[in-house]
Amino acid sequence: MRKGNEIELLVEGIEFPAKGFGFVDGLKVYAKNTFPGQKVFGRVTKKRKEYAEIRVSEVREKASYEEDQKCPHFGVCGGCSSQTIPYEKQLELKVEQVKDLFKEAEVPTGEFLGIETSPIQWEYRNKMEYTFGDEEKGGELTLGMHMKGKSFGIVNVDKCVLVDEDFRNILDTTVKYFREKGLPFYKIMPRTGYLRYLVVRKSVKTEEILVNLVTTTQIDFDLTEFTELIKGLNLKGKLKSIIHTESDALSEAVIPEKVNILYGDDFITENLLGLNFKISPFSFFQTNSLGAEKLYSIVRDFMGAADNKVVFDLYCGTGTIGQIAAGKASKVIGIELIEEAAMAANENAKLNGLNNCNFIAGDVAEVIKTVKDKPDIIILDPPRSGVHPKALDYVIKFNAPQIIYVSCNPKTLVTDLKVLETKGYEIEKTLLMDMFPNTPHVETVVKLNKK
């Protein structure tokens, strides 16, 4: 077997995140987003002594348990990977992958409590970031998601089933309008064009909708007609905000260099477990609101009785976990790298009448050195890269009786848990939460106690 060869592979097992594997001539071969029982065909993209990887071009045989796809974009759009897998099987595979990581790292799970299901499997997302582009080079304007296995192709996802019909309506109306106007989309190379992204957010409890059109400054285009068009849509939810963000940044991330409010406010409000949270166009907020309520309830339950206790909420984002914990604690201190998020956290705490919370902007690894309070409980909710080693050192030095680790990446989770174990922490229990049905992702919540 050599790089560039095309081979057929029977998928026999799976490793996180949904990397199926089988064996060809005794060599372990990985195929991303495949599942046990499938027979796939693809090209070898990497060949090592111990393993190889292929990019799948065709699923030649489905697994016996697979169902028909629900979405017409499945297989072309890169958004979903497990839509044909029955939900109970998705959960089973996620549990298997996470438990295998713990076993491989020789980290105990403590009492393993299984996996909590998402309250809804479809139309659960409260945010979508759509990209302007074309499906084929030189083709008509499209607005949607990156095509599976391609660097530049964008597929229209006007029938996506991860969002409700308001998202689909806004997307369809927007792309048709800008096709009619003949405006060019932004091309990464040679960095020319106007239309970049359309970001839509919708809160579940209040049903408020925010629409954010992101463009470059290369064309001076009057968006009054577009604004009136969106305002005139027959939406189930309540249109609260239309924003125009101007960004000439080289980064593919939405970087707001100038923000213009075309209609309404610059935020929407979501309610979680009785608390209100203002969400700006750029706020980090869990994309499954109903799932977030379950996730944060798990954290609150893991805390147990927290009266008269000081809680640290590290990597706190807009302070959702910290504020939900505040009802049980005497004091909450949150640390968040992004200044805008920390400011929003303090604003939300004030909005909710919580005077026992303080959210600080800065790098966790640096700010944590300056905090004088001694925590009874530390809540860790780091990015996919895990807790920075310097920050983890300070977490350990605080010698908190209890740590609750909320992880979106079980690979970095087990690495950090191994360190905490060597420093005198014992894992009491582990529970998974499926926040992202039909995708490989899963949240893991672990409670640790100081021996």
Curated annotation (Swiss-Prot):
Gene Ontology biological process: rRNA base methylation
Record domain TRAM: where? 1-58
Q: Which UniProt keywords apply?
A: 4Fe-4S, Iron, Iron-sulfur, Metal-binding, Methyltransferase, S-adenosyl-L-methionine, Transferase
Family matches, as Gene3D superfamilies: 2.40.50.1070, Nucleic acid-binding proteins, Vaccinia Virus protein VP39
Q: Which NCBIfam families match?
A: rumA
Query: Which PANTHER family does the annotation name?
Result: RNA M5U METHYLTRANSFERASE, TRNA (URACIL(54)-C(5))-METHYLTRANSFERASE
**What is the official name of this protein in its record?**
Uncharacterized RNA methyltransferase CPE2114
Q: What organism is this sequence from?
A: Clostridium perfringens (strain 13 / Type A)
The organism's taxonomic lineage, starting at the top: Bacteria, Bacillati, Bacillota, Clostridia, Eubacteriales
